[in-house]
């Protein structure tokens, strides 16, 4: 027998005495006397910076012989990146633990706004524990006036935690530290109580099944076997950051060149990427005006660091299109210009790896004061208008932004004429776009714009065989690395477009979306829906979506009694029909045995246990 626990939320960074990272779940598993398993054997699947699995998985033994499986996910962005797996794990949980740090309102609101709605939809009345971890810093007696109740500072109050627990019907705990008392006796006592409850419920259900099978001494009804397991589709890992890094390294579609008269060489870049991360570059390239930004520090940073010089002649810069040469920009600070290649690599990598940037700058500049000055200028470039510079504490920022933070900012330029250098003509409408993003994210587009094709020199490019809505969804994926189809039909159209432009990861996303939508439909909806499942299968095969076509065949076989009654079932090929008949559920053998059993029951005038 096993117990499955799902832990969600970020309780903050905690450490063992030997400076090894720990947390609420791992500390409990390592210290509880009821849980067996040494420290090294607990962790089965640690999150790495490359693969980024959704959950960290722990396995141990509890109460002697009970298998304990814990899945822990501290970051919502990673949880949301594979919602197919995440939803299934929450749906199968016996206990859910929600945790946050009382000194970090960001982690509390992440739990409240993101995790709680998912739990409400997916969980089936399983016990929930809300753990508020940490001791509040600078906590004062709360003011009761209306002006103060709107904002309690950076600490999460007890009232807010209790209110969240009431909303979910959960048990609320405050753990001031991760010591033996709070972990072993307080948190552990509550968790082990719910574990015993779950074991009792599972044992009771098992005993009921045994009583039902042993109560009938005549001919036993036929046993309905479980349907075959559906093929599992694994999502392709994102290569968004490497795509834009390669764009910087290959110097394709360059439209801006930075230089300093006293520094040899130039630094090439792309306006669209720079503007997606910085209002300084938006102001420099006239994407926004000073009136739009309304932040004197950003305006001052732009004027102090950069100046456009359209008359400059730069023989060292690559000029792929002589008719539209890159824009020359003077960098007024020579030291900043000498480190600009490292700064751009930092920006193109997501602008969160501050420690690596500081090391790169320190290798070039020996003076620590100069290094601090350069880092401070980078922070000013990335500042958000009208807000205090949130990048003061780089380590905190790095911990909260492990993924790209400007993939959503690129959406600001989607289907907008700002900085656009190519226009697609679709169904009589025009869609502006940016060659740099298209070349970086799509190999077919890169070959089209860089080869000896008409599109390489043309600004207006016609697109055939795709609707405007589908093509806009395709561009949205290229710009943001995500998409959300409106339904199965649009997902199939987007899959066809992705196959046409050979974007394999988008194909996998569409496949997972279609599979998830079909799996979530109840039998009654499957029977009444107008969607032609056989036509969907044939399209998947025609467009080389092997994973989806194989899954659809298994889906038709598993729901044989529904789809065999539909007229399109006759459109299956001989090979497909043979596969469906072989793997159908329920099987022909079971239906024959059931008919014989019914006949026997009616002949003896007994009560049928099956029906």
UniProtKB/Swiss-Prot annotation:
Its EC number is 3.6.1.-. It comes from Mus musculus (Mouse). Coiled coil: none annotated. GO terms for biological process: male gonad development; retrograde transport, endosome to Golgi. Its main location: Golgi. Signal peptide: none annotated. The keyword ATP-binding applies. Gene3D superfamilies: P-loop containing nucleotide triphosphate hydrolases, Potassium Channel Kv1.1, Chain A. SUPFAM superfamilies: P-loop containing nucleoside triphosphate hydrolases, POZ domain. InterPro entries: BTB/POZ_dom (IPR000210), P-loop_NTPase (IPR027417), SKP1/BTB/POZ_sf (IPR011333), Small_GTPase (IPR001806). The keyword Transit peptide does not apply. This is Rho-related BTB domain-containing protein 3. Transmembrane segments: none annotated. Residues 420-611 are annotated as: Interaction with Rab9. Residues 254-356, 420-487 form the BTB domain. Interacts with RAB9A and RAB9B (at lower level compared to RAB9A-binding). Interacts with M6PRBP1/TIP47. GO terms for molecular function: ATP binding; ATP hydrolysis activity; GTPase activity; small GTPase binding.
